[in-house]
Amino acid sequence: MVRLREIPRTATFAWSPGPTQPLIATGTKAGAVDADFSNDTQLELWELKLDDAEQGVELQPVATVSVDSRFNDIAWSQPSEQHPRGIIAGALDSGALVLWDAEKLRTGASDAQIDQIDKHTGPIQAIQFNPFRPNILASAGAKGELFVHDLDDESKSFRLGKAGANPDEYTTLDWNKKVAHILATGSSGGFVTVWDVKGKKENLTLNHFGRKTVSAVSWDPDVPTRLVTAIPTDQNPLVLAHDQGVLSLSWCPQDSDILLSCGKDNRTIAWNPHSGEQLGRISGRDKLDLPDQIQPVEPEPYSRPASFDGKIAVQTLQNTGANADQSKTAKQAPEGEDFFAQTHAEPQGASFSLKSPPKWLKRRAGVAFGFGGKLVRFGVVDAKSKITISTFAVDSDISQASEDFDKALETGDLTSILESKISKAATDEEKADWTVIETLTSDNPRTKLVEYLGFADQSEEAPAEVKKEAQTNGDADEGSSFFDNATDEGNFLSDLAARKGAKTNNPFQVYTGSESEADTKITRALMLGNFDAALDVCLKENRLSDAFMIAICGGEKCVAKAQAAYFKRQSDAPNYLRLLASVVGKNLWDFVYNADLKDWKEVMATICTFADQAEFPDLCEALGDRLEEAIAEGTTSYRKDASFCYLAGSKLEKVVVNWAQELQENENAGLEQSETDNSFSIHARSLQDFIEKVTVFRKVTQFKDTEQSKENDWKLEPLYAKYVEYADIASAHGQLAIAEKYLDLLPQKYPAADVARNRVKQATRKGAAPAAAGQRQSQPAAAQRGQRVVPAYGAPAPQPTPAQRTASPYAPANPLAPAQTNSPYAPVNPLSQQAQQATQQPPARAGGAYTPAGYQPAPVQQGYGGYGQQQQAPLAPPPQNFSNPNGPSIVPAANRGHIPAWNDTPDFGPPKTASRRGTPLNAVASPFPNQQQNYGPPGGASPGFPPQSRPTPPPPPKGPPQGPPRMTSPPSQAGGAPPNAPNPYAPSPAANNYAPPPSGFAPPQQAPVQRGASPYQPPQSAAPPSNRYAPAPGSQPSAPSGMGGMPPPRNIAPPPGQFTPGASAYAPSPYAQSPAQQAPAAVAPPPRGPPQGPPRAGPPPGGPPQGGPPRPESRPGTGQSQPAAPAAARYPPGDREHIPMVSRPIYEILGAEIQRVKAKAPAQYKAHVTDTEKRLNILFDHLNNEDLLKPDTIQQMNELASNIQAKQFDEAIAIFQDLMTNKNDEGSNWLVSDVITFDADVGVKRLIQFSKSTPA
């Protein structure tokens, strides 16, 4: 409890009601003596000024009125129209009841006193206003006098009870807080009486105290039949925890679970009256406390009762810290004083804070929006707290429209949809679009398109036959045809004989002698059937009519030649010949590109009539593009026409751009015209029309998106953006299935859909069955985690019992051996500073599927050379399930959906501690006592599996192995692989961008141990590490390069109590830290084949036989003595839902920036931008898992992202350089490149460079 204010008075008091600034009215207490022995009696007002920081603790009165008698009680009524601050009533010791107007009293008006009522014949002990009717005031006092006053009309006041019937004095009273006409009183005779004021009668009398005075009575604020009483008797104070009598009670009107009691033992105690729990207490140094009160409007401050030391303290119920005087310790009493006098100087402080918030701080009701259109509400229903989840729609019309459209699509009745849309179209452009789409549903769309353009095939009526007058004498009319007067019988052709033996009376000569040379050539060519030559002569002589007749006989080739020659000669011919030339030559592109745009309908009709089916879409697109170019020049009326061409050619990627512009225009028009709808509703409806149009068009044309697998440069990107927006609106209205349907139409690599797609999938994901969940809970945690690490590509290997060893063959002999291995799975530098802080990174499969995260496989070696093999108990060989070397490769576990939790971190049960048999100490030259030299491989190696260089595991225990096997191996090739055989899982050294830097980055080294050259060993690329636990050289036979071994187990920290290895399971890199800082070892894979040569040294007698994984054993003298904590659960790579809010600006700003750069970067930088994006995804994965990055690093990254967003690249570079200098251990994968051969930095640095170079 915190003391807020103090009033230096020994007085009775009352709080001001109402929402105004709190005031306290005090009246000099009857029977109390001031420190100055003053006889003055005053009514004073005090303003707390809790919002004034300059106000001191001790207050000064704002108004003072002198009274002729002292006060026993004060009451303050609710505000009213006549009295805006209420009425203050004073119960005087003289028996007078005085009323003041609080507002006039505060302003110092002379007429502040309203009235004085003198009905009591003795002192008035208690008064109180009715909480429901502020004009009703009850007063009780000596001689059993109890009056109910109507301040509006004093003539209606009356007395309860008969005069002389109760000689006791009323000491306290309280109105019921639920029933307006119920009043309770307490008397000096020990009686508690419940009165029915409406009936003016006594309802109930209680007496459980004998003749003990009732000091306080208070009704429960919530329950109308419950009240609490107290007596001031020291022998039985009734309210427990008080050592002496209780003087007053105050039940909080806002929270019935808080009750204050004040006693003569100088303590104020807070209670929960319903549970009987004591919430806390305040102990004071005061001699005697008087009644306390909780403020009726804002219960947090309450008045600690006035005491006879002359103070009224205003305190809070909740403690926020000790006061300055409470923090002081008691000072040593001066010499000669009473030792026990120190106790009076002990600080008295608050001894509690409320365990639960009071009701006025609790939320009685609350509401929150949830994803998927969910509205979560909680509140009190039928006296119980209830949570309700309902679906909320911002605009019910929008959700109803989307549902109706989705149902119509499911029925497949597109005709009814089209008819409805055409009839409801608001603009001509929209109606034209739907009409064109409707024409595409017909059996012959081209014919319908021609009809829509207004070029229906209407055969002209034959002209009426004109009767010609017979010509008389004279020649025929000039220009008349020779055949005009001919009859059918006189037809020249009909006179020719058509059958064998027929003779006519019209003989002719083949050559008359008057023929020209051309005629002769033509005749000769026709006789010989050489139509091509005859055609050439006709064309040369410009006899086009004869040429066409001959071409008809000569076939298509001749016809084409005649047509070409004809059109060539008609340069000044009518325009229809240009059209005819395009049609005949099947070259409609000339007509499309060169025809005047005002005749676009004619061009479109020609395309629909003559275009080849394969060229038709492209011709329509070309015509639409010409119309679009005209729009760009300012002729906007062509947009509808261009959309028609795109629709006819099924070019969705082109028409969707026009529809998007139309969408924006419709939205702007709706905002101008509508007076009731909000902008969201108008936008959502316009978007709904857009989506319906696109969806129906795709259904009608059976459109197939061929760019689903592309990573960028999508033609339909404007449509994808609308799909994402529509999915968000559908999700907000609870239509998750509809949202998911449209999100599935987007490419998987479309970045803007990642968040929406993940949220929808999580919201629609079904939970596990209750039975399965219960079964999982019943399993031990270790068993559950152990089962997850068993891969599906092979059965678990049998778990043999390791034999007891006689000597320790596991200690390395050479402290300076470099860490190189020929195994494509053995990672290099697993325990560098970067790797130690990133042990929980997700695997980065740059090359092999089994490459552990954070490690780069070493370059393929030609042999083991001088790098020795630590002798140990090997793992059991994998099951003999060999596959054809040329057969299909093993499907990675990441691509197998049926493997449950395949990527979870393994866990192992607690090991049994094996007793270590004492071994004699050997005299050795090694710097480590009792260290045995390394030998060759154990004699019991499985045939067909070459030995693999691997680090030293801890020695096995003597007992049987515990827990499930750590890892089983995949099926290997029968008989082993030939020398130099490529390993399908081993990445090449240059294929991994995450390889550690070569020797140029190595820290200062110790001098390496000189050793003989090995025919199998390549030259060293760096100095050996200064690690005394590195494996010894020259103790392992060589193996051919490219021989793959089992994938190593994931480098994880074991659970507590697992084991304490003495050295790393992987050979340390040249820049590894000391063994005391290295992570716990993991078991190395088993050998994969026989040795490729004689061993340098035979195995020691009694060496460990072949068996299962060696069990760890506690060994003193190593740097690691405490087991590491189990690895925390990680989210899958690419998940961005768990990025905390403090890190989300980094993801949002950098992600948006890389997408901007990616869209505008030149093609030659595509690979660099892609690599930068991959590095940033590593950063985002760490942010999502809340690992690796420290809070100060995240803060710096936020500043860096803000600088990039603000185009302040110099500041961003400065922050980046600081991170590279001081935080390189946290950002080696995403800040810059680890491979020097690339000769370029990537990650954040390259993003800054790209952003600086890419225009906005």
From Swiss-Prot:
InterPro entries, sorted? SEC31-like, WD40/YVTN_repeat-like_dom_sf, WD40_repeat_dom_sf, WD40_rpt
**Keywords for this protein:** Cytoplasmic vesicle, Endoplasmic reticulum, ER-Golgi transport, Membrane, Protein transport, Repeat, Transport, WD repeat
Return the Pro residues bias intervals. Answer: 944-968, 1046-1058, 1083-1111
Localization of this protein:
Cytoplasmic vesicle, COPII-coated vesicle membrane; Endoplasmic reticulum membrane
Q: Which GO terms describe its cellular component?
A: COPII vesicle coat; endoplasmic reticulum exit site; endoplasmic reticulum membrane
Q: Which GO terms describe its molecular function?
A: structural molecule activity
Region feature (Disordered): 460-481, 761-1139
Protein topology in the membrane:
Peripheral membrane protein
Q: Which biological process terms from the Gene Ontology are attached to this UniProt entry?
A: COPII-coated vesicle cargo loading; endoplasmic reticulum organization; protein transport
Please report the residue spans annotated as repeat (WD): 7-47, 66-110, 119-159, 165-205, 209-241, 242-281, 368-390
* Residue spans of biased composition, Low complexity class: 765-809, 833-862, 969-978, 1023-1041, 1061-1082, 1123-1132
Q: Give the quaternary structure.
A: The COPII coat is composed of at least 5 proteins: the SEC23/24 complex, the SEC13/31 complex, and the protein SAR1. SEC13 and SEC31 make a 2:2 tetramer that forms the edge element of the COPII outer coat. The tetramer self-assembles in multiple copies to form the complete polyhedral cage. Interacts (via WD 7) with SEC13.
Family indicated by similarity: Belongs to the WD repeat SEC31 family.
Q: What does this protein do?
A: Component of the coat protein complex II (COPII) which promotes the formation of transport vesicles from the endoplasmic reticulum (ER). The coat has two main functions, the physical deformation of the endoplasmic reticulum membrane into vesicles and the selection of cargo molecules.
**Protein name, per record:** Protein transport protein SEC31
